[in-house]
A protein has these predicted regions:
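Glycine-rich phosphate- or other oxyanion-binding loops that anchor nucleotides, phosphorylated ligands
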Residues: 149-152
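Residue-identity detector for threonine
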Residues: 4, 12, 22, 111-112, ...
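Acidic/His- and Gly-rich active-site-bordering loop/insert found
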Residues: 2-102
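Short, well-ordered alpha-helix to beta-strand connector turns
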Residues: 44, 163-164
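Extended substrate-binding grooves/exosites of carbohydrate-active enzymes
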Residues: 146
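Active-site metal-coordination/substrate-binding segment of hydrolases
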Residues: 65-137, 142, 157, 163
Length: 165
């Protein structure tokens, strides 16, 4: 079974599949950021990137929800690139070898899964792009290089965080 065939959480698994299929080790996550930005634009969302490469995706309030408070969802896009000793897996080029066995999702011991924070990014993208989600203003903030020193978060400027739709 593939991630995209799981019945639960519709878009979350589709986004997690995209994330797992796109190499994103620390310092190498800009391609993934570009793909998520493209998906957000396809959904009609406002997308901005700062000079470091962090993404901010804004979604307007759902109809009838303009009086609700805004929500910010934050996730980092990089993963810790660890693999089994002697493995030829290349985190800069290879998609993660995701396996589903029963109720477990893993990489068969070959590599880490990257669920920290890949699943957080997938959930945020699902919330941002799903028109059935009824909420006030929603912001997705996706930072880079968290695993090697919170570099993306440290590079955030107040101006990038202020404002909204």
């Amino acid at each position: 079974m593939k991630l995209t065939e799981l019945p639960e959480a519709r878009g979350t698994w589709q986004f997690f599949d995209l994330i797992c299929a796109t190499p994103h080790p620390s310092g190498g996550e800009r391609k993934l950021a570009g793909l998520l930005a493209e998906k957000a634009r396809e959904a009609g969302l406002r997308v901005r990137a700062d000079s470091f490469g962090n993404l901010r995706i804004d979604r307007a309030p759902a109809p009838g929800c303009g009086d609700r408070p805004g929500i910010i969802l934050q996730a980092h896009l990089d993963m810790v690139p660890q693999k089994r000793g002697g493995s030829s897996f290349d985190f800069a080029k290879d998609p993660l070898p995701v396996r589903i066995e029963g109720n477990k999702i893993h990489c068969g011991g070959e590599t880490t899964l990257g669920a920290d924070d890949g699943i957080g990014a997938a959930l945020a993208m699902d919330m941002l792009t799903d028109p059935e989600v009824k909420c006030g203003p929603l912001v997705g903030l996706f930072t880079l290089e968290e695993e090697i020193g919170l570099n993306g978060a440290r590079a955030l400027s107040p101006a990038f965080l202020e404002g909204g739709n």
